[in-house]
Amino acid sequence: MYSIYQASRDQIFTRKYLTMTGAVANPVIVHAPLGASFADCLAMAGGTSLEDYHVLVGGPMMGKLYTKEEAKNLVVTKTTSGFVVLPEDTELIHKKSVPVALSLKLAKTSCIQCSYCTQMCPRYLTGHPLKPHMIMRKLAFCEDPETLLSDKDVQQAMICSECGLCENYACPMGIYPRQVNLYMKGLLRKQGFRYQKPTEPLQQLPEREYRRVSSHRIATRLGVDAYYDYKITECLELQPEQVSIPLSQHIGAPCVPVVVAGQTISEGALVGQMPENSLGARIHASIEGIVTEVTDRFVVIKKGGGQ
């Protein structure tokens, strides 16, 4: 909302408020420039005592998980809402690390067709024709998933929001309808399938109100309840010595760099422009300094030397 407020007043988006939580010394809100590293954000929270850990970018349900090594390359983008440092034995890490091949095998061997994944699916409850249990059922009786791509029930996988409620809470067998949906969506896109929205208005199911799930219960299932009731009282300004600003931070075409190495720029200066006749969003410098590196993927700016 704050970013929308800024945009409505023609203020350039160069900094992001995000949470730095999990297994850290001092959970904080960080006001960070775009392109600031995860390591700099972690330092603002006092670091972590863990030798090995994973980093969750976003929330437990739909966030992306990175290993400690992968996290070395993480930077703040326009869509970063927070970083969560997690111990290696966290249940959430296990669930998000299951290979697709195993998910498909479990769909064939372990699904009991209780239909809880459908009964609790937010899409289904708001009137969409998505029925995850039907997709699981049809996968169980086929050798090649690609033979199902013309099936109407399977095509509904395209409207899965990937919220993960089915596999993180609803399924009593601990299998992975969300990941199966994601896999089928990939096959459908590869085939060139485009989902056609219903022409009639969707009708919310009356039982929707009674099938909502407590976020705290989900956090407990995922093993992250220890970080659920944090009371963060500090908001710290991050002033890094260097930022690495990605040229693709959004849906649409990546930006083309409009600066060169050695150039001195001020905060808010344009560093990336959308290609002609392409949808996207401009990228601006988040700190004042000298451009030290330019590639087709990012622009590195070192603090100092502003004009």
Model region roles, listed by residue range:
Residues 1-165, 169-173, 178-188, 194:
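Redox cofactor-anchoring modules in respiratory/redox and cofactor-processing assemblies
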Residues 146-148, 156-257, 263-266, 270, ...:
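Flanking helices and flexible, charged tails adjoining ferredoxin-like Fe-S electron-transfer domains
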Residues 19, 32, 56, 79, ...:
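Generic detector of intrinsically disordered, low-complexity, polar/charged segments
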